[in-house]
Amino acid sequence: MRKSLAAILLLALTGCGQSGDHAWLGYAEGDTAFVAAPQAGWVANLRVERGAQVKTGDLLFTLDDTAQAAARDQAEAQIAQAQGQMGQARASLDLAAKELTRQQGLLRSGATSKQALDQAKSAYDTAAALIAQINATEAQARATLTGAAYQLSERVVVSRTQGRVQDIFFRPGEYAPAMTPVVSILPPANVYVRFFVPETEFAKVKLGRKVSIHCDGCAGDLTATVSFIAAQEEFTPPVIFSVGNREKLVFKVEARAPGGLNLNPGQPVDVRPL
C-alpha cells in the first residue's frame, strides 16, 4: 500500500513536467527560535500568548525569584552592617592613634613605661586590623550582591528577536527546567519555502538562482533565491501540495479577545470574515 501511494505521488510530480506545467510543488517553512531561561524555576508570569507579535527587548516571561531576591537582600544587609561597623571602627582607630602618639611622647620624657607604649601600639594595630577586616567583609558582600543581582536578572526573560509567538510550552505555575524552551518565536526573516523539483528538471536549479513564488490568495508573486540543494534525491517528498488536494488542506488559526470570549469549551462556532 505504501509503495503504491509513493508511486502515485511520484507520478504527480513527474506529470507536472510532462504536461508543460513547470511549477514545482512545495510549502512554506520556518526556523523557530526557542526561548529558554538559563535557570530552572517556577513560571511566575507569562506576558505573551500564541500569535502575539513581539520585538527585541519585549518581556516574555518571568520565573519565581523568591530565593534570588532573598540572596540580594541578604547581601545588601551585609553591606549596610559593614558600613555601620566601619564608622565605629574608624572612631576606635582614631582614639588608638592619639593614645599611641601620647604614649610615645611620654616615653621620651620618661613619664611612662615601655609596657604602656607597647599596649598602646597593640591597641592601634588591633583597630587597624579591624578596619581591614571590615573592608574585606564589605568587598565580599558587594561581590555577593553583584552575583545575586545577576541571578535575579536571569529570572526575567526578554525577547532577543522580533517575530510572532508560535507556541507556549510552560505556563504560570509550571516548573521549567533550565535551558528548556518556554516560548517559541518565528522571526519573519526565518520563513522560507521548501519545494520539490523532478529529476528531469534538476539541471535548472542552481545555488543563488532566483525563483518566483505564487500562493493562492496572495496579492502577487514573491521572489526568492535558492539557498540549499539536497545532496541526493528522494522518491517522494514528505508532503505534497498538489493543485488537486490544495483545497482540502486546513490551517489552524486562532482568534483572541481582551479578557477572553464568553464561550464554553467544545462549543461549535462558525467564523466568517468581517
List PLM regions with ranges.
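Sec-dependent bacterial lipoprotein signal peptides
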Residues: 1-14
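N-terminal beta-strand block that forms a small beta-sandwich/beta-barrel module immediately after a flexible targeting
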Residues: 12-49, 53
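Amphipathic alpha-helical coiled-coil/rod segments that serve as protein-protein coupling scaffolds
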Residues: 21, 55-164, 169
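Surface-exposed patches in structured soluble domains
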Residues: 27-28, 43-47, 53-59, 151, ...
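Exposed loop and linker-edge segments at protein-protein interfaces
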Residues: 47, 53, 65, 169, ...
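Short, surface-exposed secondary-structure boundary micro-motifs
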Residues: 59, 65-66, 181, 187, ...
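Surface-exposed connector loops and short turns at secondary-structure junctions
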Residues: 195-223, 247-271
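Short, solvent-exposed secondary-structure boundary/capping segments
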Residues: 232-244
